[in-house]
Amino acid sequence: MVWRQAKWDEPLIFELNNSGANRQGLLINKDDEIRSEIKEMKIPKNLLRENGPNLPSLSELEVVRHFIRLSQMNFGVDVGIMPLGSCTMKYNPKIEEKATAITESHHPLEDEDHVQGILEMIYELQNWFSEITGMDECSLQVPAGSAGEFAGVLMIKKYHEDHNRNYKDTMLVADTAHGTNPASAAMAGYKVMYVKSNGEGLVDMDILREIVNDKTAGFMLTNPNTLGLFEENILEISKIIHSANAILYYDGANLNGVLGIARPGDMGFDIVHLNLHKTFAVPHGGGGPGAGAICAKGELVNYLPYPMVEKVNGKYRLSKIPKNSVGKIATFYGNVGNLARSFAYLLGLGPQGVQMVGKMSTLATNYLIAKLRDIKELELIAPNRHRKHEVVFSVKQLMENYGVSANDVAKALLDSGFYAPTIYFPPIIEEALMIEPTETESKETLDMFAEALKKIVEDAKRNPEQLLKSPSNTSIARLDQAYANHPSTITPTYRVLKLRRMGKINYLK
């Protein structure tokens, strides 16, 4: 596949019109009927701006072309495969954009009787996510997966406090865990202790038995883990954790690999957080805000964030407050627009479709492994084990023998028209390439990706110096990362840029 990205010398939108010409569009006067109804709005003087907003004076056409050009220098799943491991960058059907539009004309403070349809949707999602995860109840109040994770850790802390177990001050975290796991635990005031993996990439059971004690508050784990391996000892892990009156916490980042096939609740987990922007078709990052869910079973449902939707006398009400709730994690009721996306996604799939997601994502990963298995420079921990949603290769041999790193391989993939996989994660794998193809990619796409990776390995052995110059087909080549991130040069906003140009900022603190 021949691919070359567009390259525009595109200025910032604030700097597009340097002539100073006024290209402002049509100003529409207030409607007379509205004016007579509300009169003039009386805004306190201390809230009024001293000067008008510093907006560029541009025509509609200039604005459209500006953003189209920027989009041509970007890359997303609508352009090609994005195999970012542990990110689940699946294609999100466009029909779901229509679903989220139903929330745009409503306000979170609107009367509940006016938004019965939205509340019914949230109510159904609460039940669906509880069923999918094997939990008893679910709260959608959290605005994102990481916020749901933090809420889950707060639930563990409050639960132990209510049971006079303040001595439980340590949270166990798998060494393959996402960075948010130890971060959430530390934010909640816990000491963090890592549980090492064994030679097969699974939780080392001997180490786990040795370190679990009365001070253990919980164990944060993904299953499948971040190597794409299913923790086959999960039931025994559950027994060990519960024997210490600790909580088994499920990070839902990797749920896609077992979706509709295995449920965390049946594995012995007590609390689950979900990333709707991974598993349930909500766009990532620049595509829009994330969305989360936090689910629990048994006594722990009493600690879920509020409010939750319940059905009272045939009406849906945001009135359910668990008796020991950790409270609100954010204002209002989560990212409702994104909940609508997930609702449409699940409604379209149905139970059998949900199960196919887990099966096809697993099939895609293992097909890719089969295509790449004979390349000795792509090392695989526990090579005879099947993977679930993702796989981690090590290119340590390329680095040792030819000076080609995981970063270099990722840059070379960009030149082939593929987004780079996650690199250097998890940190227990040297020179890691973490690949998650997802269920939405075709066999043909996986074949092309595998061939591109094979060619890069051969190029690394034949002409490593040339490979180190990649990428050359992208809009921007390699960045000087130290320069870009140094406090004396990092420029995150236009305001900072202007202050730098005026010499008013030297270092960002």
From Swiss-Prot:
EC class (word): oxidoreductase
One Pfam family, short name: GcvP2_C
Modification sites for N6-(pyridoxal phosphate)lysine: K278
GO biological process: glycine decarboxylation via glycine cleavage system
Role noted for this protein: The glycine cleavage system catalyzes the degradation of glycine. The P protein binds the alpha-amino group of glycine through its pyridoxal phosphate cofactor; CO(2) is released and the remaining methylamine moiety is then transferred to the lipoamide cofactor of the H protein.
Assembly information from the UniProt record: The glycine cleavage system is composed of four proteins: P, T, L and H. In this organism, the P 'protein' is a heterodimer of two subunits.
Entry protein name: Probable glycine dehydrogenase (decarboxylating) subunit 2
Organism whose genome encodes this protein: Saccharolobus islandicus (strain L.S.2.15 / Lassen #1) (Sulfolobus islandicus)
